[in-house]
């Protein structure tokens, strides 16, 4: 017993020293996290975390920066050990294959009559490239890779095939699905597992480069459903049918979901709420709570459309890179981006969004992995820790105190307790917070609760009756928000020479102590001994 008590004291002193070093120059403010634990407000998929692989060739450049290198579906080094380990760590990772060029891709199936040629840059035509092709040899290699890494694959199909594009971007005609059906059949006959087939990329609403009306898109989606039903008639479960994979517009999505009826399993929208990657004010937006709150409107609107329509589809974020046109170096691939990314994951969960696909797994300046050496960027570790700690049920959570704290709570993945995510967007103030459990709420998550009522919850003791919690404090190396090295409890997260990922280990804190959130830091708090009705 004495040994354990001494060990607990040593651990506490280590934690205290770490926190003291990170906040010594800061002012301190108290706050309270209120968690409504009687019922979940949102439920996410078990494989909620998703990332994208794109089609962009090395010639893809934005604002004079060429950030894609060999990160395309067609040229990515599938033998890279770090890449394989990074995917395996999620067990499984959902990967959505798609992007702008998917709508000018043909598939080299045995019955294809067209030559299989690579994309060629041509700025005078739609999307800036000539038609490209997916060789079936490469498709074989990709599927061997997916099987080896345990990847769950969502494949985005070319939805412009057969249509003509007017000068104003309007796409005329129905989807010619001949090549797509042949590709789907080839995939099934080779026993390649696809979890979902998605129709088109950013063709809904106003579109990006081209657009398809909601009524026609619904007809095309029904045709995709019929193809999937034919090809997979003896397969269970069938792949999902997904669409439209574009930017959210209320009227378009309302019409589409009502007319697509039950042909659709998941409706996908894209999010680039931070604006262009060239914007000099990206960090200001990321650290502004009011700016972060704005995306809640679209989450709420889509949730309501689904609720009030005849569809059985669920909401997904099919692609989200924050800053469009490949992001911004040392921002979207640096520590500061985790404030935006984790806030998005938390907000999406609250509004019952089942899957969230980050643009990208690798490629551009917003990849979870470095494009050239494959080492994980900070957001990779943020996603991995989320995956390990945050369970499927999202709990309504508010914070009373500074507006610079973002707070989210889920039932824990590893226990019947809860995991609280706290992010401090302030650069000088250390926040010392306590957690209280409540059984009533009346306002949205962006507002403070005005009245509280204690819930009946239970706390169970650990060894020797000492109740402990597990904390994961994430900070930037040297306090630099532009750093691409993330510290976990003061230690750098880095792969070793063998390409192995570092262990994700918490510090243990006596649960009677408040939670300390240092300036510009992120804290995951696993409270395995807090039992609330929603998580029981």
From Swiss-Prot:
InterPro entries linked: Glyco_hydro_79, Glycoside_hydrolase_SF
Carbohydrate attachment residues: 30, 122, 176, 191, 265, 308, 370, 427, 438, 510
GO molecular function annotations of the record: beta-glucuronidase activity
Top-level class of the enzyme under EC nomenclature: hydrolase
Record key words, sorted: Glycoprotein, Hydrolase, Lysosome, Membrane, Secreted, Signal
Localization in the cell: Lysosome membrane; Secreted
EC numbers, comma separated: 3.2.-.-
Main location: membrane
Signal peptide: 1-24
The keyword NAD is annotated on this UniProt entry: no
Superkingdom assignment: Eukaryota
Gene Ontology cellular component list: extracellular region; lysosomal membrane
Key word Acyltransferase present: no
Membrane topology category: Peripheral membrane protein
Positions of the catalytic residues: 202, 319
Pfam name, any one: Glyco_hydro_79n
Assigned protein family: Belongs to the glycosyl hydrolase 79 family.
Entry function: Endoglycosidase which is a cell surface and extracellular matrix-degrading enzyme. Cleaves heparan sulfate proteoglycans (HSPGs) into heparan sulfate side chains and core proteoglycans.
Protein known as: Heparanase-like protein 3
High-level lineage: Eukaryota, Viridiplantae, Streptophyta, Embryophyta, Tracheophyta
């Amino acid at each position: 017993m004495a040994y354990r008590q001494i060990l607990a004291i040593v651990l506490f002193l280590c934690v205290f020293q770490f926190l003291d070093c990170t906040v010594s120059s800061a002012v301190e403010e108290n706050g309270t996290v209120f968690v409504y634990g009687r019922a979940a407000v949102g439920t996410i998929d078990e494989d909620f975390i998703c990332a994208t692989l794109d089609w962009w060739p090395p010639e893809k450049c934005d604002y004079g920066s060429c950030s894609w290198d060999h990160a395309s579906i067609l040229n990515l080094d599938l033998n890279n050990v770090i890449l394989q380990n990074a995917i395996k760590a999620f067990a499984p990772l959902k990967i959505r294959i798609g992007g702008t060029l998917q709508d000018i891709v043909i598939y080299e199936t045995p019955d294809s009559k067209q030559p299989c040629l690579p994309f060629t840059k041509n700025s005078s035509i739609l999307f800036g490239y000539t038609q490209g092709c997916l060789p079936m040899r490469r498709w074989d290699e990709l599927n061997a890779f997916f099987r080896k890494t345990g990847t769950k694959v969502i494949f985005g199909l070319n939805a412009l095939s057969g249509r003509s594009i007017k000068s104003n971007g309007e796409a005329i005609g129905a989807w010619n699905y001949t090549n797509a059906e042949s590709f789907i059949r080839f995939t099934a006959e080779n026993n390649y597992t696809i979890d979902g087939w998605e129709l088109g990329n950013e063709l809904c609403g106003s579109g990006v480069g081209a657009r398809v009306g909601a009524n026609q898109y619904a007809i095309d989606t029904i045709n995709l459903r019929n193809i999937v039903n034919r090809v997979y008639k003896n397969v269970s479960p069938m792949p999902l049918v997904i669409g439209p994979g574009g930017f959210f517009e209320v009227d378009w999505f309302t019409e589409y979901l009502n007319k697509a009826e039950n042909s659709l399993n998941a409706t996908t929208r894209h999010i680039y709420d931070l604006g262009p990657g060239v914007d000099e004010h990206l960090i200001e937006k990321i650290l502004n709570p009011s700016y972060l709150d704005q995306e809640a409107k679209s989450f709420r609107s889509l949730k309501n459309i689904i609720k009030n329509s005849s569809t059985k589809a669920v909401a997904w974020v099919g692609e989200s890179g924050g800053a469009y046109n490949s992001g911004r170096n040392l921002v979207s691939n640096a520590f500061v981006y985790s404030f935006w990314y984790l806030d998005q994951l938390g907000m999406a969960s609250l509004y019952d969004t089942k899957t969230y696909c980050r643009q990208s797994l690798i490629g551009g300046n917003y990849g979870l992995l470095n494009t050239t050496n494959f080492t994980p960027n900070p957001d990779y570790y943020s996603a991995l820790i989320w995956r390990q700690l945050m369970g499927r049920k999202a709990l309504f959570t508010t914070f009373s105190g500074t507006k610079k704290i973002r707070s989210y709570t889920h039932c824990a993945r590893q226990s019947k307790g809860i995991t609280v995510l706290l992010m401090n967007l302030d650069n000088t103030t250390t926040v010392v917070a306590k957690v209280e459990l409540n059984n009533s709420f009346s306002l949205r998550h962006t507002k403070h609760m005005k009245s509280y009522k204690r819930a009946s919850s239970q706390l169970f003791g650990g060894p020797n009756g000492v109740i402990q919690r597990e904390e994961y404090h994430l900070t930037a190396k040297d306090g630099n928000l532009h750093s691409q090295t993330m510290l976990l409890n003061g230690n750098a997260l880095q792969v070793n020479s063998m390409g192995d990922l570092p262990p994700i280990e918490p510090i243990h804190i006596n649960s009677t102590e408040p939670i300390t959130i240092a300036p510009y830091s992120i804290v995951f708090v696993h409270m395995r001994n807090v039992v609330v009705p929603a998580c029981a």
